[in-house]
Curated annotation (Swiss-Prot):
Subunit structure comment from the entry: The complex is composed of two ATP-binding proteins (MalK), two transmembrane proteins (MalG and MalF) and a solute-binding protein (MalE).
UniProt protein name: Maltose/maltodextrin transport system permease protein MalG
One Gene Ontology MF term: ABC-type maltose transporter activity
Family membership noted in the UniProt record: Belongs to the binding-protein-dependent transport system permease family. MalFG subfamily.
Membrane topology field: Multi-pass membrane protein
UniProt topological domain (Cytoplasmic) ranges: 1-12, 112-123, 176-204, 281-296
Domain of life where this protein originates: Bacteria
GO annotation (BP), single: maltodextrin transmembrane transport
Sequence ranges assigned to domain ABC transmembrane type-1 in this UniProt record: 85-281
PANTHER family hit by this protein: MALTOSE TRANSPORT SYSTEM PERMEASE-RELATED, MALTOSE_MALTODEXTRIN TRANSPORT SYSTEM PERMEASE PROTEIN MALG
């Protein structure tokens, strides 16, 4: 028997669709505007969404190529954008891998092991995570200044020191992975132990394959966080060639001259590694969601 929808229900459905499209347009419009600015002549932040005379000059400069102006003069790239992009990918990738590794092993200890003070440590980790990183900038500078005297590759103006600083923000990820581990029946690991598996083998061969979705989520979130992080990176990095892209892009906004076109091209480039990582990790997300243990 066919169901007949009332007029009020149809209106609500249409209103919901209109609201969703409006919200989607609100999200997409700034991105389209940034892309338009990157193809617009000059360095103007205002103008039509479709440039009157599209140009690739801003993209050439961002990619490291010089451009020849109408009067014959040559304009070299003002900043090493591709170097900054590589720095961002390198720092983001290494940080995300280490964050996943540390968070996973820590979460396993909190989820499966019993030891004194476990709940207190978990609560303390969450409380400290609530304070923003900017409150600790002075302490971080003093810490890495002193640390660099003994371990140079972890000191100021080093990517190693920046990566080490990012590892301090794993508390939320530990809580997230811990909750996922606790949702997996421990009898699967017990069965593996009966078959002669060591705790490490049970963790690596049983628990980790079932936890791929949450590990992929943590990796993506960590990578995005590092790629877009500015306060800590701008504090610890002082050499222009060592900047990440998020920090280096600020160089385009001079008080005397705002290079909006070049800034927009660099901003679009900054989204490339994030998009690539998400598309690659999406395979693991979908594949991991269909994986599971069967007890019988």
């Amino acid at each position: 028997m066919a169901m007949v929808q009332g007029k009020s229900l149809k209106y609500r459905v249409w209103a919901t669709h209109i609201a969703m499209w409006a919200f989607l347009a609100l999200i997409i419009f700034p991105l389209l505007m940034i892309i338009a600015i990157s193809f617009r002549e000059g360095n103007f932040a205002t103008g039509s969404l479709i440039p009157d005379n599209p140009t690739l000059d801003h993209w050439k400069l961002a990619l490291g190529f010089s451009i020849t102006n109408a009067d014959g003069t040559v304009t070299p790239p003002p900043f090493p954008v591709m170097t900054w992009l590589w720095n961002s990918v390198k720092v983001g990738g290494i940080s995300a891998i280490l964050i996943v590794a540390l968070s996973t092993t820590s979460a396993y200890a909190f989820a499966r092991m019993k030891f004194k003070g476990k709940n207190t440590i978990l609560k303390a980790m969450m409380i400290f995570q609530m304070f923003p990183a900017v409150l600790a900038l002075v302490a971080l500078y003093a810490l890495f200044d002193k640390l660099g005297q003994y371990i140079p590759f972890l000191g100021l103006n080093t990517h190693g020191g920046l990566i080490f600083a990012y590892l301090g923000g794993i508390a939320l990820h530990v809580w997230t992975i811990k909750g996922y581990f606790e949702s997996i029946d421990s009898s699967l690991e017990e069965a593996a132990a009966l078959d002669g598996a060591t705790p490490w083998q049970a963790f690596r061969l049983v628990l980790l394959p079932l936890s791929v979705p949450i590990l992929a989520v943590v990796f993506i979130l960590s990578f995005i966080m590092v790629i877009g992080e500015v306060p800590v990176a701008s504090l610890l990095l002082s050499d222009v060639d060592s900047y990440t892209l998020a920090v280096g892009m600020q160089q385009y906004l001079y008080p005397q001259n705002y290079l909006w076109g070049d800034f927009a091209a660099a901003a679009v480039l900054s989204a490339v590694p994030i998009t690539a990582v998400f598309l690659l990790a999406q395979r693991w997300l979908v594949g991991g969601l269909t994986a599971g243990g069967v007890k019988g």
